């Protein structure tokens, strides 16, 4: 089932320097909660500056949903320590609040009024909040409070020069984009390995079902927790943040222009379902528009091709201008065993897997096959640790035992690990392979199995409160290592100033501005 990568690996072993200079970044979302685990109803802390313009600390869907962002970094330890400093500083500024350590929230009642993230009075800020109003009205606010970790990854130019002979200009843009699309297609085919190893949301609180019937064979604990005994990541299931209305958009990952055309089509395609919500009611705007996607960011995807946008530029226009610059991996649950929601083992594994995905052959993929890849993901998400579980290839009928496929994949990853270790010295990447491959013979070692044991004993709420309290105490005590208090204060003040400048520069009323942007 695993493609034959032996030639590509032999090439890599002859050109190890092609991997020198991998760049990464991390984003981590987390809810601010009170000591009893309920959602904080306070505004974004003043000490953290403006959520609209702060470089490292912002908000996602809700006012209480923090998002931490590291700068692009070539050094794993430095990036993780930077992320830890953001957590350390924030933990000291949250008063009695703490950061929820799980992907799935718990103490949020059905229909509870969840304050949307606020970004000030500028047209840009109001647009961001209106987009969130649309998400709330389309999918429900509860779904939007699920948190995850995003891992951004790019290969050095030396890789593309050695692999594809690229120089500069239009041809380089096309070749590099084609290489990243190959990575993405392999990710759709084999990325289920991420929830298998690192999924950490095997259970949900009953409020998540919102009284709706479900066909999933949930088991229920006395405290009202629902779980699937072999599930890995319910966050990635249809109970979590997915969008069924997007499944027939026909967006594919074979070619840059084809992908962008699909994305642009989706933001212009009217939706009957969302038209029923209405765009405005009693003078209040309910969504940006009633199309399948309000804006491009609404496209639900476990991985995204990206390029840093210029002012006023859409993500797809940035891709057309310069091609794919980096990849955003979006399938990581919060790691409940780390105070910062992610750890070094995961980052090193993702490095290995991304390199494998870009090396392995990846035939072009129709939108039908893309839908078929979802079958493997769903199996792993809902019953990944089940003995005897099998996986298929695309829409074909042949089945393969998951542990065998996993071990075959790791045989290749071990060779990538040897190459990366040869550049950096040490055996860190190989060690990660040895630790993780054991999860295929013993699923009890996976994150989902480990956290489920705690959840069955303590409930989701009890587990979240205990871990959150321990991490709060730890982070508040630890000294800052990379950033200093003065730098946080300077960025707080600068971010507030930047927001004020944006607000002062606005010249037209929001309604007129929106008419041009909706």
From Swiss-Prot:
Q: In which pathway does it act?
A: Sulfur metabolism; glutathione biosynthesis; glutathione from L-cysteine and L-glutamate: step 1/2
Q: Which InterPro entries match?
A: Gln_synth/guanido_kin_cat_dom, Glu_cys_ligase, Glut_cys_ligase
Q: Which domain of life is it from?
A: Bacteria
Keyword list (alphabetical) reads:
ATP-binding, Glutathione biosynthesis, Ligase, Nucleotide-binding
Which EC number applies?
6.3.2.2
**Residue ranges that the Swiss-Prot or TrEMBL entry lists as coiled coil:** none
What's a single GO BP term from this record?
glutathione biosynthetic process
Q: Which Gene3D superfamilies match?
A: 3.30.590.20
Q: Which family does it belong to?
A: Belongs to the glutamate--cysteine ligase type 1 family. Type 1 subfamily.
Write down what this protein is called: Glutamate--cysteine ligase
What's the source species for this entry? Salmonella typhi
Its gene is: gshA
